[in-house]
């Protein structure tokens, strides 16, 4: 039995999809425990590139059952559009299963998300506008719509009417928008009932019974540690807990059953949207990382902000997630750049901080303190073992390992599934 949690260690887009794709072929279940269609990832299989948004990367594995856990918020229109796209390409997306307790994104959530961001102007968070935040807000306010609700029309209608009593007041009186007709929302959800019905299960029961039977489970977290609503750069965060603890909550698997916590981390750092980013680059090197690394958001098409590796963030992520291992991605992007700066600490108003500053204000004012290491010029995209890497690349990896306080067990040297060096297999932990 193995229960492995995959967590982004930075601000997202670290390559979690690749890690899931590699490990997904060795497990029985791949679970997405949080998020929605607001965080895309790219997976390359057999030379084919797949851009996934709501579905877990495990849907591309022939052996694993992909599951959307209770912590996910689901846009049904986006879900079936993504599934149909995969089916058209020969993927058996019909194996997907969905927790009956997952919450649903309604069209009014998306409307509210967009008008609220527009209203905030320069103070906007930089959301994707897909209704994720408002859906989670309804969840914690106990007025959300769950998957199970669509199978009882009277409950569905009651919940929608109750929710719109408040939301229409907000839309009409505050944002000068038209009121939403409750019956239209009811019919919207009822239109998906028959296709949805065979996919819905008691996910926590299925997963725990699987673990009892010795099966392997992989939990594929969305977003990343620094976007966690509790542990991230609040308020520039997502609305869920994309950390190891959140994976337990969003799947129904208890923390004592977790065998490995695998952090996915780039050899440099990126971020999409607003918020503090101490190592962000505004010079030719930022442009180099963006261009060479292909740093464009899968969901939004926005260019990602780029910066050097931040070991303060890495140590923080290792601590709050209890990482047992790290998966270092995109090492090949740094080939041939001469010198590689590594942020080892911050300067905040003349005071050195080796760990994450306590306050939001201090983090906003943090200036990176760098050390540099020599880069390598050799092509590493064909390296199969750690010893195949040039000495300078090995030294860089070992230094990141030392600074992060966690062993690096996987190293990505290219986008392909086979372009991964395995130093330690977490399936054998």
UniProtKB/Swiss-Prot annotation:
IMP binds at residues 13-16, 38-41, 128, 142, 223, 238, 302. It catalyses: IMP + L-aspartate + GTP = N(6)-(1,2-dicarboxyethyl)-AMP + GDP + phosphate + 2 H(+). It holds the Pfam family Adenylsucc_synt. CDD domains: AdSS (cd03108). PROSITE patterns: ADENYLOSUCCIN_SYN_1, ADENYLOSUCCIN_SYN_2. The keyword Cell membrane does not apply. It is found in: Cytoplasm. Binds 1 Mg(2+) ion per subunit. Mg(2+) binds at residues 13, 40. GO terms for molecular function: adenylosuccinate synthase activity; GTP binding; magnesium ion binding. Substrate binds at residues 298-304. Its cofactor is Mg(2+). One of its GO terms (biological process) is IMP metabolic process. Pathway: Purine metabolism; AMP biosynthesis via de novo pathway; AMP from IMP: step 1/2. Keywords: Cytoplasm, GTP-binding, Ligase, Magnesium, Metal-binding, Nucleotide-binding, Purine biosynthesis. GTP binds at residues 12-18, 40-42, 304, 330-332, 412-414. It comes from the Bacteria. GO terms for cellular component: cytoplasm. Plays an important role in the de novo pathway of purine nucleotide biosynthesis. Catalyzes the first committed step in the biosynthesis of AMP from IMP. Homodimer. Belongs to the adenylosuccinate synthetase family. HAMAP family: Adenylosucc_synth (MF_00011). This is Adenylosuccinate synthetase. It comes from Corynebacterium diphtheriae (strain ATCC 700971 / NCTC 13129 / Biotype gravis). The gene is purA.
